[in-house]
A protein has these predicted regions:
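Helix-rich cap/lid subdomain of alpha/beta-hydrolase
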Residues: 1-39
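Alpha-helical elements of Rossmann-like donor-binding domains used by nucleotide-donor carbohydrate transfer enzymes
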Residues: 4, 20, 62-65, 90, ...
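Conserved strand-to-loop "acid loop" that flanks and positions the catalytic carboxylate
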Residues: 46-55
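Short secondary-structure boundary/capping segments
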Residues: 38-41, 64-66
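Catalytic active-site module of serine/aspartate enzymes centered on a nucleophile-bearing elbow/loop
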Residues: 72-109
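Conserved alpha/beta-hydrolase "acid-adjacent" motif
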Residues: 56-62
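Short, proline-enriched alpha-helix->beta-strand connector loops that line the catalytic pocket
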Residues: 42-47, 69-72
Length: 109
């Protein structure tokens, strides 16, 4: 990612936070899209997905498609690609909701 790309990736963070993102980011693995994943959990387990509606990295329409294909419980938020940084409270709430739902389903099983 070039320095100007940070605004596209994390545009809802402050300038100082964007500088930290730039300073600490790393390039993805060169063979990222050729890797085979064994045992994709979303095919057999409940899933949750946060669609970042202002994401300039992965288009929200693609995120919705993926989430629907997964059968995920979908949350949408006005966020860039990094809602875990810009909207951590919502992300924590979704994680807790998911954990509680899974816990309830295993207790009732």
């Amino acid at each position: 990612m070039l320095p100007k790309g940070v605004a596209c990736f994390a545009g809802d963070l402050s300038e100082a936070e964007q500088k930290v993102v730039w300073a600490t980011h790393a390039a993805p693995a060169a063979d990222l899209f050729n890797q085979k994943v064994e045992g994709t959990a979303w095919k057999s387990k409940p899933s949750w997905y946060i669609v970042a509606k202002n994401d300039g990295t992965v288009q929200p329409e693609l995120q919705r498609f993926v989430a629907k294909r997964m059968g995920a419980t979908i949350y949408e938020i006005n966020s860039s690609h990094v809602p875990m940084l810009s909207n951590s409270g919502l992300v924590i709430d979704v994680i807790l909701t998911a954990a509680n739902a899974v816990q309830r389903s295993t207790i009732g099983a």
